[in-house]
């Protein structure tokens, strides 16, 4: 295995549950009693395309040096020293305790890279705990539910970002590209047609066997619950003309054309100024949590009064959260001049939500069941794009052509040099460009690259992340491949 992760944290935060999730079997004893795990346990683990070893540890305890708790703590400290990185687990539902703060300091002193894992994030009231987690100084918390398997894709991406692709895929790639520099000849090789895609089979971009998680959001009374009842074929959710009937984020299992779906109906999301009573504040927080655990978010708009300010705010939130949005223009049965109205709605979608070009939008009637299949076809396609992975070879062949056609501008009389590009994550697609002076790169050129990626690699309707950094040549230090 290429690297080792130690799962640490105070007792009863879900470390052993996460260990079992990563190992794929119930190897660790799990109970509600603190201190169930007394010895550190190490096992081969897998998280999607990542293969590694994981260490389950006793809960960190403050105790006298001659006590059992002290020996458990010593086991944990030994695990930290053996590991390449630490998964520091907190209980988002319970919030940050003094013990969390004490042992976060100990983990920081170890100098090991850390992913802050906010477990039990599916629970009501966990939102406050995740916000409080920032005070630990371990970076942004990664919300998961180890028990239910939610948030695992984000945990995978956090590990890759922490250790770097070269580290986490070291064994898989040690036989890959030669030890070269980015000379014109090397760039020419990248642009050639004879380079195989090393990632195509090694990292499958899409797994249609896993349930697709969909959140259905929108303003109050847009028809979200009616739509879900039509999908399920039963009156599972309370509906009516009164705005705000749905208080909680409610989940339901469904199957569409053989594809398993987890549906989340959410409370209607209002402007903050109108969120007065405590219960409604909790409902909005529940909706935000549903969005974060979803993969695709269907934004239900009332076609008779679309694109209110709240609609745009909801869409912007979904895009900033990196989820895959699809718009459903509901109550289409009430529209008379449908062809003209639809053309107008498509134009407004492109104009009012320019941050995601090609956003998919479908007219439906939740009450009559019209347009549901078309909506789901667009949901599945958007989900596939959201999971898309492009090999480094293809990206750099494209980048070389882009630079030749439109090089970066000169800043303060000095030309910016773009060296190479790689994809660092999916869900949504995220890319890193290595260049000479990242801070000086105009945002207009960054948008130019994003738009080019979207068009060339057929990625409409999903957020695309692109960051700039200064780094060494990605091929430096690799052993030259012998022919």
From Swiss-Prot:
GTP 1 binds at residues 9-16, 56-60, 119-122. It comes from the Bacteria. SUPFAM superfamilies: P-loop containing nucleoside triphosphate hydrolases. One of its GO terms (molecular function) is GTP binding. Keywords: GTP-binding, Nucleotide-binding, Repeat, Ribosome biogenesis. Disulfide bonds: none annotated. The keyword Nucleotide-binding applies. Residues 3-167, 212-387 form the EngA-type G domain. GO terms for biological process: ribosome biogenesis. Associates with the 50S ribosomal subunit. Belongs to the TRAFAC class TrmE-Era-EngA-EngB-Septin-like GTPase superfamily. EngA (Der) GTPase family. This is GTPase Der.
């Amino acid at each position: 295995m290429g690297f080792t992760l130690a799962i640490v944290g105070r007792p009863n935060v879900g470390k052993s549950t996460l260990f079992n999730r990563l190992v794929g079997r119930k190897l660790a004893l799990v109970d509600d009693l603190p201190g169930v795990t007394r010895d550190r346990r190490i096992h081969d683990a897998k998280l999607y395309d990542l293969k590694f070893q994981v260490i389950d540890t006793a809960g960190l305890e403050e105790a006298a040096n001659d006590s059992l708790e002290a020996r458990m703590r010593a086991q944990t400290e030994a695990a930290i020293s053996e590991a390449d990185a630490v998964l520091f687990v907190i209980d988002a539902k319970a919030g940050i305790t003094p013990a969390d703060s004490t042992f976060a300091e100990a983990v920081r002193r170890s100098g090991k890279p850390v992913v802050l894992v906010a477990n039990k994030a599916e629970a009501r009231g966990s939102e406050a705990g995740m916000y409080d987690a920032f005070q630990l100084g371990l970076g942004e918390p990664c919300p998961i539910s180890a028990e239910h398997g939610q948030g695992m894709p984000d945990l995978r991406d956090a590990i890759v970002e922490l250790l770097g692709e070269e580290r986490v895929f070291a064994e898989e790639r040690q036989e890959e590209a030669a030890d070269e520099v980015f000379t014109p000849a090397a760039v020419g090789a990248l642009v050639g047609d004879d380079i195989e895609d090393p990632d195509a089979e090694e990292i499958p971009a899409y797994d249609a066997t896993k349930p697709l998680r969909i959140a259905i959001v929108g303003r109050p009374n847009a028809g979200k619950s009616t739509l879900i009842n039509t999908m399920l074929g039963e009156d599972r959710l309370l509906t009516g003309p009164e705005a705000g009937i749905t208080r909680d984020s409610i989940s339901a299992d469904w199957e569409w054309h053989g594809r398993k779906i987890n549906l989340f109906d959410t409370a209607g999301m209002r402007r903050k100024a109108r969120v007065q009573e405590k219960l409604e504040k909790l409902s909005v927080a529940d909706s935000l949590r549903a969005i974060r655990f979803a993969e695709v978010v269907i934004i239900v708009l009332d076609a008779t009064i679309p694109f209110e300010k709240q609609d745009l705010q909801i869409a912007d939130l979904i895009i900033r959260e990196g989820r895959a949005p699809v718009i459903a223009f509901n109550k289409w049965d009430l529209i008379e001049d449908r062809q003209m109205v639809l053309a107008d709605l498509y134009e407004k979608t492109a104009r009012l939500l320019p941050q995601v070009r090609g956003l998919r939008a479908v007219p439906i009637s939740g009450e009559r069941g019209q347009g549901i299949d078309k909506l789901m076809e667009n949901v599945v396609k958007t989900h596939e794009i959201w999971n898309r992975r492009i090999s480094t070879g293809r990206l750099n062949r494209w980048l070389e052509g882009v630079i030749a056609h439109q090089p970066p501008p000169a800043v303060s009389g000095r030309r910016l040099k773009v060296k190479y590009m790689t994809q660092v994550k999916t869900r949504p697609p995220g890319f890193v460009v290595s260049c000479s002076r990242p801070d000086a790169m105009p945002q207009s050129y960054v948008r130019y690259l994003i738009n080019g990626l979207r068009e060339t690699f057929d990625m409409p309707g999903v957020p695309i992340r692109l960051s700039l950094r200064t780094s060494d040549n990605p091929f430096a230090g690799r052993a030259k491949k012998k022919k």
